Each structure stands twice: as structure tokens, then as C-alpha cells.
Amino acid sequence: MRLLKKLFLILLFFRFAYVFACDLPGHFDFDVSNSIDEEILYSGCYDTVNLGPHIIEYILTKERAEARGVKRPSASFTQDRDGGVLQSLLAENGYSLPHHRDYTRSGYDRGHMAPNGDFNDTYENALATFFIANIWPQTPNVNRVEWLRTENKTRTLASEYLFVKVIIIVDEFTEERVGNIQVPLCFKRRVYDLYTGELIYEIDVYQLMEPEESDTL
């Protein structure tokens, strides 16, 4: 009975804890699901002005946080990891998604917001994070050190709390661009205990330096 109550509260929090800001002009929401059981892996609000996700949110479980059996997919970031739904929606409204190649030799990494490391329970789930609407330009230091540190902290919290809700917000930008993609100034991570709704981790990661030498291909 206690477990059922906890699961009910988790689902209730998942339903009402956050409302996307996709009523903003030029913003569109999307979901990326597992094609086998149709589980929503992560959701987002896509910003067509700056060409990346304004918000990404998902639930991270202890099981997924501790999964180690899947090798990182060697894959390009495509426009159709959601089955092409967002791409079609944008096209209907006169917008389009960037391409994997837009980042090539830019000096910036393709930085996951929902990282493949949080979905390592199956290869398909990890691959689903390689969605062009799930990334922003990040300097190599931010992507591989500072932001990675926040991802590792989040996985530690998921192991401790069993279920956490992760919200990534990107709403501040530099004047730099990668092609037409605006380079973010700050990446904001908020992690909540699903059982209590308590904010248990909050961090803003700024990238103020010029991009370093990157092997982005």
C-alpha cells in the first residue's frame, strides 16, 4: 500500500509539477518516446527563435541512473527521433530544425540536455537522446567537464531518492552563433524529489569563454 501511494504521488507530481512555457511565440512542445512500449522518455519545448530546446524535462529512475550495460551510441543527431512529429509541426508553421552538420568544425560540442547516460537501460532509449532538438552548442569544457559534473550529480541523486524529476532550462544567450543557432550563455538544471516535490539540486552553468579546440565532426 505504501508503494502504491508513492507511485500515485509520483504520477500526480509528474502531471502537475511543471507547465511548459510553450505559449511563447515561436515555441512548440514535443515528446520523445520509446517505440516498443510507447513510454515518454523526455519532453521538451522547442525554441524556433534560437534553434534549440527552451526546456527539457524527464523522470530519472534509480534503475536507469545505475544502468551500465549500453555503450554510447555512435550516431548522428537526427531530426526524427520523435518520429518526425516536431519536424512536421514546425514545417506547418514555417520553421525548420537544424542539422547535425551545422555544428561541424564550429569549435562547439553538440551538448545533450537529456543525456544518453540517463537512458542507458537500453540501446534504443540511449539512441533516442540523439535528437537535434535535444542539444545546444556547448564549449568542450562545459560539455565534458562542468555540465557532465551536473549530470553525474543528478544520477547520484536518482540513486538516493529512487525517482527524480529533471528540468533543464535554457533562456539566456550570448551574441555568438553557430550558423543560425544562438549560443546559450547559461544552462539551468533543476532536480526534484518526485515523492515530496522538494527541489534537491539547483545549478546554473555559464559558458563565458571562447570555444576551445573541438573534435566535433
Question: Where does each model-flagged region fall?
Answer:
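Classical Sec-dependent N-terminal signal peptides that target proteins to the secretory pathway
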Residues: R2-A21
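Short, His- and charge-rich active-site/binding loops that engage polyanionic ligands
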Residues: E39-D109
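Extreme N-terminus nucleophile/cap motif
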Residues: F20-S43
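Generic detection of long, well-ordered alpha-helical segments
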Residues: N34-S35, Y46-D47, P53-I56, A65-A67, ...
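Domain-level detector of nuclease and nuclease-like folds
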Residues: V85, E92-L217
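Signature of the chorismate-utilizing enzyme
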Residues: L11, R64-A65, R189
